């Protein structure tokens, strides 16, 4: 076992990629924005990453495809499209650790579903640290840590936390009460509702 402090910050940085709630995109082409973390990625690498995370179709549909010039912060794209570019960038960077900070916040349900699929592909074979209020984002995690007022109040898998009927189960039931993985009696206990929708 080695301590993180034994590594130089630059060395650690090469192994970590971040996808933020509001992705950083710069004025430049889509190709350049995806290639940002690695100069060695060629057109095939960029397109493969975009296909993997589900961004290729929207990129190919743009008049200049991967050569489309982005405005500052990617203002000429939707938030969901910017997120997908950020996922493609993280995939091309081939980092071992991914930090996803509210990566699905402020997007519609359809786009969230696309991004959930992209997230699953992006996290394959990597360690992911996912900071989320949308609990569907962490549902498949090996370990969920629930914080309240800066303190850890629960840890476990989705199934274990639902069964425990604690804070996670209450939040999940309030947001996703129609999902089949919440037993009716649990839904009633955590929400106080007698009727199931």
Each model region followed by its residue ranges:
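C-terminal portion of ABC ATPase nucleotide-binding domains
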Residues: 52, 60-61, 117, 134, ...
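ABC ATPase NBD Q-loop/coupling interface
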Residues: 1-11, 113
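ABC-fold ATPase nucleotide-binding domain signature/coupling loops
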Residues: 56-85, 107, 178-197
């Amino acid at each position: 076992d080695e301590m993180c402090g034994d590594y130089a910050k630059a060395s650690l940085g090469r192994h970590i990629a971040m996808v933020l709630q509001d992705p950083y995109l710069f004025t430049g082409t889509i190709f350049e924005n995806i290639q940002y973390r690695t100069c060695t990625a060629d057109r095939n690498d960029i397109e493969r990453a975009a296909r993997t995370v589900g961004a290729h179709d929207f990129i190919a549909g743009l008049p200049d495809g991967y050569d489309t010039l982005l405005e500052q912060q990617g203002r000429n794209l939707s938030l969901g499209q910017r997120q997908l570019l950020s996922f493609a960038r993280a995939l091309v960077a081939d980092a071992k650790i991914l930090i996803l900070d509210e990566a699905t916040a402020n997007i519609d349900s359809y786009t969230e579903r696309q991004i959930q699929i992209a997230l699953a592909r992006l996290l394959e074979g990597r360690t992911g640290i996912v900071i989320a209020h949308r609990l569907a984002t962490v549902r498949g995690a090996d370990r969920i840590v629930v914080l309240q007022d800066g303190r850890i109040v629960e840890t476990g898998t989705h199934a274990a936390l639902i069964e425990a009927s604690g804070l996670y189960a209450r939040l999940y039931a309030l947001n996703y009460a129609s999902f089949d993985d919440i037993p009716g009696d649990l839904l009633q206990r955590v929400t106080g509702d007698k009727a199931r929708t």
